[in-house]
Amino acid sequence: MHDSLVILAGGASSRMKKEAVTNNLSPEEIAQANERSKGLIGVGASGRPLLDYLLWNAKKADYKNIYIIIGEQGELFKEFYGSKMKDNDFHGLNISFAVQYIPEGRVKPFGTADALFQAVEQYPELNSQFYSVCNSDNLYSAEALRALRETESPNAFISYDRDAMDFPLERISRFAIAKLDQNNQLLDILEKPTEEDLEQYKDSEGKIRVSMNAFKFNGNTLYIHLKNCPVHPERDEKELPTVLLNSVKENPQTTVGIPFSEHVPDLTAKEDIAEVKTYLAKYYPDLNWNNKN
């Protein structure tokens, strides 16, 4: 089993910075939403960031080495998790930072695949091991993170039951869906599915499966696909689902969808802040870092 987790936190947070259509946020919360990376917004007890809770679950799942991919202006991460670029101790987790630099001629970062490629270039040891990858603005359960560690499949992703997601239907309908075979091996990922698509994409349990960007990768075989990832024609970014599908085409039957049926709290827009705060207060009333259980 591997013990490295790469956390994607270098994005532009464009949707979070849009004007809120809710009036239940304080001026401080609005300011943080406009200025901070999403995972650093203070939604937890004593104003601690969402990322604390993700790291807490990662520790419960027995990860040891955490690589946080930050943007070029990511100094605030170091105030929370360690001042050095690598090997900071945060409650027993070894925290290192990779920087996603913006290419010349672009204004925004070049996408999740570019972020991971820059990280493995800065930490090449990842290319000779297995590792997990996830977002910084989602709160994945310790059980889901542990499942990525424990699977024997070279590559994997958490394959969530779409109906278990506690989001508005309009939002859920925008999620890309995964097509799996009878053994839960990934065959395809479909963006913007129609109602007709949904029926033929049901898995062996009759469920519609979605990815929330929680992956396990074989660094050795993934590297070439990260390096050669094409740019998405609509979004003008290099994206991890593209890398995953290209890897599957070259290495079929090596990427399993691990079925999970649970909600994944998500900080995408200002409207999510109050809901995530309520969720954390209910399910994570106290983070006692000295007690893993």
What role is predicted for each listed range?
Residues 5, 189-293:
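Conserved alpha/beta core of the MobA/IspD/sugar-nucleotide pyrophosphorylase nucleotidyltransferase superfamily
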Residues 139-224:
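Conserved core of the sugar-phosphate nucleotidyltransferase
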Residues 92-177:
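Conserved beta-loop-beta/alpha segment of the NTase-like Rossmann-fold superfamily
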Residues 16, 77-81, 148, 226, ...:
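Hydrophobic packing residues within well-ordered alpha-helices of enzyme cores
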Residues 40, 177-180, 257:
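A structural signal for short hydrophobic beta-strand segments in well-ordered beta-sheet cores
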Residues 76-79, 143, 243, 275:
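Phosphate- and divalent-cation-binding pockets in alpha/beta enzyme and binding domains
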Residues 5-7, 68, 133, 157-158, ...:
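Structural beta-sheet core signal
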Residues 1-7, 13-31, 44-129:
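Conserved N-terminal catalytic core of the sugar/cofactor nucleotidyltransferase
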